[in-house]
């Protein structure tokens, strides 16, 4: 773990945050060195929920923190991306694939929900579909099989 930011407050649901600096944009977050000169950011955690420290080694399936609404965020979500340097807003984003995930739904009316502060409409996929070696598409709802510790 190369960077941990914790203790920033949650934002008001559905309201655009005011006065967020670039340093606070990711909110409570961690940056992980994933090898090969690449890094992964996990951002917008709940305050004081991060379970790792700088210098810690983590493994697949480890819980890092609780999903929240800190930083430049309108609603609770996990922001994840892979990048070329350990600086979220000053890096090149890199493509990645996920070993496997299940598509359980898709969202509708994201812009309206954000503008009006109303719940996001989710259309469930029936039956849910397993996807392998792919990147989840924008506006999809996915689940991941939890591995045993």
List where the protein language model places each region.
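Short histidine-centered loop motifs in beta-beta connectors
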Residues: 38-61
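Short glycine/proline-centered loop/turn elements that form peptide/ligand docking sites
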Residues: 51-53, 69-76
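Zn2+-dependent peptidoglycan hydrolase active-site motif and core
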Residues: 1-46
């Amino acid at each position: 773990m190369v960077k941990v930011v914790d203790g920033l407050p949650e934002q008001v649901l559905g309201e655009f945050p005011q006065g967020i600096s670039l340093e606070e944009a990711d909110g409570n977050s961690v940056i992980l060195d994933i090898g090969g000169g690449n890094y992964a950011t996990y951002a917008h955690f709940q305050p004081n929920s991060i379970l790792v420290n700088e210098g810690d080694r983590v493994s697949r399936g480890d819980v890092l923190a609780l999903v929240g609404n800190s930083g430049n965020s309108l609603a609770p979500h996990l922001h994840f991306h892979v990048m070329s340097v350990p600086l979220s807003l000053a890096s090149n984003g890199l493509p990645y694939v996920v070993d496997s995930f299940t598509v359980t739904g898709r969202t509708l009316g994201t812009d309206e929900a954000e503008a009006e502060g109303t719940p996001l409409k989710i259309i469930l996929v029936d039956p849910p579909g397993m996807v392998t070696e792919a990147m989840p598409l924008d506006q999809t709802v996915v689940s991941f099989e939890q591995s045993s510790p």
